[in-house]
Amino acid sequence: MAQVAANGARQPLLQLLRGPSGKLWEVCIGLEVHAQVLSRSKLMSGSAASTLSSARPNRNVSFFDAALPGTLPVINRECVHQAIRMGLAVDATVHPRSLFERKHYFYCDLPLGYQLTQQRAPVASGGALHFELPESAVVSEHGGAHSDEATFDASKYKSRKEKNEALKKWKAKQAKKQQDVISRSVRITRIQIEQDSGKSNHDLEDDSTVVDLNRAGTALLEIVMEPDLRSPVEAGQVMRQLQHLLRHLDVCDGNMEEGSMRCDLNVSVRPTNLGAEADVESLHNALTARTAAPFGERVEVKNMNSIRNMMRAAEYEARRQIALIEEEGGEVHRETRSFDAVTGETKRMRSKEGAKDYRFFPEPDLPPLVFSEKLIQEISERMPELPEALKERLCAQYDLTSYESLVLVNEPGAAPYFETVAAQNSRPSKVVVNWVLNDLFGHLKAVNGDIASSPVTATELGALIDLIQDGTISGKIAKDVLELMFYENEPKKTPLQIVEEKGWKQIQDPEEIRALCRAVLDDPKAKKNLDAYWKGKTQLFGFFIGQVMKQCGGRVHPELANSIMQEILEEHKQ
């Protein structure tokens, strides 16, 4: 996939796919997300809201859920409040009046024969979901109109010196890309409340189908987005951001693998009428001109149970449409397809229904939902600090980079953990964020854990950082202490107790350090290196310090060791 950054790297990226003929195509992706609302009971009945497939089948089913004649719906107030929270979080307009409608279709796991939804008068509409994409996540699949080097090509350089200098610049560029983020947003069309269906199980030995109605009637939030996304990478990041926001608000647990958060894709493509030889400006002009070709017919893709599979489905479907047009001369028709995670392909299910097919009409058994300004204000005041505001505050208050704040906010529990550690002024925020993001996260990743399951509390990590700051231990020793705290701290010991038991306190006595330095330089084996040092090979200074560290297991205060070694070398010179 080629990327074109029009008018500078901070502009939205135009991400293109190359077709079989070499022509570049633009991809358009829209998302519809269904999130099961966290609530004790279902949307229209008092039955327990069941989100786990492990629950006993048909245990949490009321008469209304089973569509027994004469039963009436009773709206769950908490589910409605959850929808308002979500609308406020994305700066949508929360409408003072909304309506439920019946959407008719016939599945064996939909007892009513219709779904209660909000097609024409949703709880909220408009707004946008803001997200940030690490620049390093945008990877070119080939050269072409624009491509950044993803790997270092050593064959371009004749001499070792040229290669080393180029490699150094390349590494610096890659490090900067890792820290840089691209800010984007996707517009929200509407946020509506609706009922979930039951669950059909077709995987039986006798080819029969059984129906579990535990899920039937569970409250869903349908979040419909405008087709603003231009790559599977963007779509994946939007899903991660939405998943994090839903969890942050405690609206949905966001577990796609368990079906509590589901996503439908709408994918279409259009040609740029330009080939690989086109420059960045030509591509930008072609794609933004009024004469640009419209996007083709969209295809809906269902059945993705993870963000990774959603991204795979988006890319496959875009390539399928391009190949259909270029190689077969065919047309893309509006249809619904499913994604096969095993083959990585989308497969036709049915032609796409329109609004007329569903025969929408107002729900006669439910009055309109009416929200006062006072209610909306009360819900707003009870909401937690939103991720976007939290990122901005972390950057301003602690002088973090956009990338650092992005990682802290997107990892559940990481931002409060960081702020607890950094609470005391003696702990520099840059030191703290490095220990959290690099060292602590490294151990958590190794055991597939998260902040909530970390055996090292924020207070304990802060105490460890204090030992570095006051010179009790070196940064290198601190890493060893953290490893013991993480994997072998039973019974529980403080960082200081571990340091004292292991004898790892840093040597800070100048006379003791001076004796260690003299021992290294007075060693007959050091004469050759000393001669080389005086002849200009000053990088051997690091070797001498390394020998000092080796003598005492790395416990010497590095700054004192450097200073004293420099003094002794000057004495030797005289």
Swiss-Prot record:
Source taxon at top rank: Eukaryota
Keyword terms of this UniProt record: ATP-binding, Ligase, Mitochondrion, Nucleotide-binding, Protein biosynthesis
GO CC entries: glutamyl-tRNA(Gln) amidotransferase complex; mitochondrion
Enzyme type, top EC level: ligase
GO molecular function, one term: ATP binding
Described function: Allows the formation of correctly charged Gln-tRNA(Gln) through the transamidation of misacylated Glu-tRNA(Gln) in the mitochondria. The reaction takes place in the presence of glutamine and ATP through an activated gamma-phospho-Glu-tRNA(Gln).
Name this polypeptide is given: Glutamyl-tRNA(Gln) amidotransferase subunit B, mitochondrial
Organism: Phytophthora infestans (strain T30-4) (Potato late blight agent)
